[in-house]
Amino acid sequence: MAKLTVRDLNVRGKRVFVRVDYNVPLEERDGQMVITDDTRIRETLPTLRLLVEQGGRLILASHLGRPKGKREPSMSLRPVAARLADLLGRPVAFVDDCIGPKVEQTAAALKDGDILLLENVRFYPEEEQNDPAFAEKLAALAEVYVNDAFGSAHRAHASTEGVARVIARRGGPCAAGLLMERELKFLGEELENPARPFVVILGGAKVSDKIKVIDRLLEKADTLLIGGAMAYTFRLAQGYQTGKSLVEPDKVDVARAALDKAAARKVQFLLPVDDVVATPVETGQVDKKGRPVIAYQNPRVNTDPNCPPDAAGLDIGPATVKAYSDVIARARTILWNGPMGLFENPQFAAGTNAIAHAVAQATQTRGALSIIGGGDSVKAVNKAGLASQVTFMSTGGGASLEFLEGRELPGVAALSDKPSSGGSGS
């Protein structure tokens, strides 16, 4: 069932609770927290402008980081309010809490077209607990609910699900924002009956992260192209040696079942024909997250399906790039989720970069519909400077994966269904 969207609403004179995803990267400079990438703020502007033009009184809510249910000044949304005001060219009020008398008074004083940004909802543990009383307090601020935070829609939290349920119970409309609407369109409707050939490119580290997606897409796709470390679990399932590559021995049966399903359904299931391997060496150092830093020596192209015993596979090789690019060039629908190798390291970024160019070229020259399914694939396309040359880039990480698995996302399920006979929706 299609969901109600902001286009269906009549919000003039009404207070609208808008859940956005302003979980932006911040860093400290001269004692101030500075936003280093405002993409997530920019992505909400069409929804906010539409609601402002329609005379809504906007109350924006978001999380930022993981403050673990307590006030953490470095994760305040105050800098976001200032940046949003700059981008919109109009004032954005900020209140240093998200519930309580001060918030209620500020919300009550809003006039048509005004915007108020609440403080980080995760400063309260009740947000992630989806606490009913906390959801009631947030919902008391507004008469209409809009969710434009697809990246958080897979979490049943107070601001993503609880508030919508309360407002709906009171008879208020709960709608998808324009960004959410696009996510549901491209990850949902467009993949239900895709133009063929439908080519799915899957990468990343673990088969366990993607197996449900693989299983579902084997029922829809014509070809699956596999890259990243997950390819080595499939190689192990085929009886090859994987050296020091990242593998999941406990997922070999799952990988074998996927290969069998592909064969039974006559889906082309392509694994790398060559790879870039290198010898991992411990440096004795740790990164910011306390993980050991590994250096890689003697990077080289390996054309043997077996990985050398002292080496790890870290990227797809040139013959694989050529084979995959040829398949992509003929595609009419392309879904890409996950990099082809350890692309954060320039030594092993060539495969991912080449696939990004192949997807962009198919989109531009053949008119293919290309969907970049969130997370690292989006980073890779941005890094290659090709964001404007693909059809759609998802803002979700875990949300995109869960949606592609066919799971109902709590934040989407809580939205009102579009009335089948038309109507204003409010």
Predicted regions and their residues:
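Active-site loop-to-helix "anion-binding N-cap" substructures in soluble metabolic enzymes
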Residues: 1-426
